[in-house]
Curated annotation (Swiss-Prot):
This is UPF0758 protein tlr1707. It comes from Thermosynechococcus vestitus (strain NIES-2133 / IAM M-273 / BP-1). Pfam families: RadC, UPF0758_N. Keywords: Hydrolase, Metal-binding, Metalloprotease, Protease, Zinc. A motif (JAMM motif) lies at residues 188-201. Belongs to the UPF0758 family. GO terms for molecular function: DNA binding; metal ion binding; metallopeptidase activity.
């Protein structure tokens, strides 16, 4: 194993994981830095620091998944024994990591109750997380809202394979009419964790937006969920400018 003697305490204050989290927010920390906060310490004098150990753990996980760019996903179902097989990770560090992973899952799976006003993509993703976030196959779901954006319910429209799912606008709007919904948010998951929309995703979104115009039921967003994160297509594509929904926002 490569020697890494620089301690976290020797880093400039702005580069230390805890200080960086407090000053910039958790989103701006690398996965290795987040692990370092959980680990607390590294392997001891003259060996890997906490950040170095975090990097080493991710390297080991990347080898386990066969994809170094998606190492974090291996934490989803890892066992204590598998973690403790990594040099420098004993029972205390392993249980801390596993507790954090489980807490993160529970946060994402805790959904707002009906009548909650859904006023952001993050809140919509929280409602849909239990149905979409960690699934091994693609699913397409719809979030049903009233005219004031209050939550009426959610419904999984279709379940596909590990790489694709199919949904037809007819099925989506049938559920909206059945529940007397005035607004919709559609969503599907990418089991790979890659949240970039495919051309098929964009084409389907445009079809559904056009159907929303005809039905006079605005489609507020299309979310892609996966691996603990989400992407709003309304925020990153011009589709809502091309097919306005008459919902009072551009």
């Amino acid at each position: 194993m490569m020697s890494y003697s620089l301690r976290v305490a020797d880093l400039p204050a702005g580069d230390r994981p805890r200080e960086k989290l407090l000053s910039q927010g958790a989103r701006y920390l690398s996965s290795a830095e987040l692990l370092a906060i959980l680990l607390g310490t590294g392997q001891g004098a003259g060996k890997l620091s906490a950040v170095g150990l975090g990097q080493f753990i991710l390297k080991q996980l990347g080898e386990r998944t066969g994809d170094s760019t998606d190492a974090v996903s291996a934490l989803r179902d890892i066992t204590p024994e598998e973690l403790m097989a990594i040099p420098g990770v004993g029972p205390a560090k392993a249980t801390t990591i596993l507790a954090a992973v489980e807490l993160g899952k529970r946060v994402f799976q805790s959904r707002p109750g009906e009548q909650t006003i859904i006023d952001s993509p993050a809140l919509a993703a929280a409602v849909l997380a239990a149905d979409l976030m960690w699934q091994a196959t693609e699913r397409f779901a719809v979030l049903l809202l009233d005219v004031r954006h209050r939550l009426l319910g959610s419904h999984v429209i279709t379940v596909g394979t590990a790489t694709e799912t199919l949904a037809h606008p007819r099925e989506i709007f049938r559920e909206a009419v059945r529940r007397n919904a005035s607004r919709l948010i559609i969503a599907h998951n990418h089991p790979s964790g890659n949240l970039s929309p495919s051309q098929a995703d964009l084409d389907l979104t445009k079809q559904i937006l056009q159907a929303g115009q005809l039905m006079e039921i605005p489609v507020l967003d299309h979310l892609i969920l996966g691996n603990g994160d989400y992407q709003s297509l309304r925020e990153i594509t011009p589709l809502w400018q091309q097919v306005p929904q008459g919902d009072g926002s551009a």
